């Protein structure tokens, strides 16, 4: 709630700084508690939860201080008529949907080890496979999204202002550029994770299985990043109710598919369910965004960025790799980034992510017109 206030008040930098400090403090406090916690799984869980709780309390106190500071010197005034009814009309369905989604997520967490065990794996092996995905693959997969979340925090007040001022042309321009930039960032990152999955997992976890699973999930990163971006833009356009409705639908679909596929196909059923549910969620959210903003769907940018990632990935994988994982990581990462960046500039794909007023061709055309 306090974070939403700072976002609406245009104090995104403060919010970002508090969030970064909270994460650092959470890590530091958890490490301190781990040193004094009793040995075993219970002590480790206590240390992690305790560090998270203390860091969250500190962040909430700082955010409340910013909230009080923002209202200092402002005389209280009466609320507009009907404001309470409007807030209840918005908050009630959001709260109910959140409760339903929480219940569905809990059911999903219970279904996964049960379904893996039903597929023939022992309880220990089932939990180990699930832990590899959630504890090793997903953190690496979602780490680059931190840059995207910072962009989303800046987008929400900008889109809300465009909507309130009825600036349809500006709204369409911002939405179009953000979708193109998200495509470029998502395809680059997904391809990079696919290329570096093996050496990265060896360096971080010393696990070949984690590398195989990371390479399997790497292409899905494009959908995950774009889904987060589209959800953020829908929030800026006051489409929270539709957003929560789509999330609830896909959570229910997730549970149904897990119940049917997990006992029969094991981890493969989980992978299929994860990909299918997120694709459905992204398709519904993107359809809503295009309808609200009036934009027309175009597959040209998506095809171009996909070809860039495939070409750069092929060049990196065909490059002879030296023995050590660190050297392979650096060499193939450099080849991939160089080929992708060069191809994006030569093909003009990178220029499409820049506003028209800032494009070199547009500036040159205006300069010729002035002459």
Model-derived regions, located:
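Helix-terminus/linker motif at the lipid-water interface of multi-pass membrane proteins
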Residues: 34-38, 99-144, 161, 201-205
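Membrane-interface junctions at transmembrane-helix termini in multi-pass inner-membrane proteins
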Residues: 1-17, 219-249, 260
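Membrane-proximal transmembrane or re-entrant/amphipathic helices at the cytosolic face
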Residues: 319-371
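Alpha-helical transmembrane segments
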Residues: 230-238, 286-300
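Hydrophobic alpha-helical transmembrane segments
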Residues: 17-32, 37-69, 249-253, 267-288, ...
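Interhelical loop/hinge segments that connect adjacent transmembrane helices in multipass membrane
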Residues: 45, 60-99, 166-169, 291-306, ...
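Helix-loop junctions and terminal segments of transmembrane helices
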Residues: 141-166
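Alpha-helical transmembrane segments of multi-pass membrane transport and lipid-handling proteins
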Residues: 172-223, 255-256
């Amino acid at each position: 709630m306090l974070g939403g206030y700072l976002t609406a008040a245009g104090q995104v930098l403060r919010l970002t700084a508090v969030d970064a400090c909270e994460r650092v403090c959470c890590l530091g406090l958890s490490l301190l508690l781990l040193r004094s916690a009793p040995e075993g799984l219970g002590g480790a869980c206590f240390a992690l939860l305790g560090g998270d709780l203390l860091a969250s309390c500190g962040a909430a106190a700082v955010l409340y201080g910013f909230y009080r500071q923002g209202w200092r010197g402002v005389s209280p005034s009466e609320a507009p008529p009907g404001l309470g009814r409007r807030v209840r009309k918005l908050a009630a369905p959001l709260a109910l949907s959140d409760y339903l989604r929480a219940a569905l997520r809990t059911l999903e967490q219970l279904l996964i080890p049960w379904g893996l065990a039903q597929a023939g794996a022992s309880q220990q092996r089932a939990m180990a496979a699930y832990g590899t995905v959630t504890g090793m693959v997903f953190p690496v997969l979602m780490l680059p999204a931190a840059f995207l979340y910072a962009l989303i925090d800046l987008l929400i007040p900008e889109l809300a202002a465009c909507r309130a001022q009825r600036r349809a042309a500006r709204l369409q321009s911002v939405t179009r550029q953000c979708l193109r930039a998200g495509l470029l960032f998502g395809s680059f990152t997904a391809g990079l994770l696919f290329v570096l999955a093996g050496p990265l997992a060896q360096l971080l976890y010393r696990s070949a299985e984690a590398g195989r699973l990371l390479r399997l999930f790497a292409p899905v990163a494009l959908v995950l990043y774009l889904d987060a971006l589209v959800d953020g833009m829908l929030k800026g356009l006051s489409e929270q109710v539709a957003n929560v409705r789509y999330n609830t639908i896909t959570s229910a679909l997730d549970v149904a598919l897990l119940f049917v596929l997990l006992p029969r196909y094991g981890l493969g059923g989980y992978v299929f369910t994860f990909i299918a549910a997120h694709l459905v969620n992204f398709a519904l959210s993107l359809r809503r965004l295009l309808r609200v903003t009036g934009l027309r769907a175009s597959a040209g940018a998506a095809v171009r960025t996909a070809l860039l990632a495939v070409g750069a990935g092929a060049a990196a994988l065909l490059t002879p790799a030296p023995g050590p994982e660190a050297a392979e990581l650096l060499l193939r990462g450099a080849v991939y980034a160089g080929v992708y960046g060069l191809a994006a500039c030569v093909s003009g794909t990178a220029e499409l992510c820049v506003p028209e007023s800032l494009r070199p061709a547009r500036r040159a055309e205006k300069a010729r017109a002035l002459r």
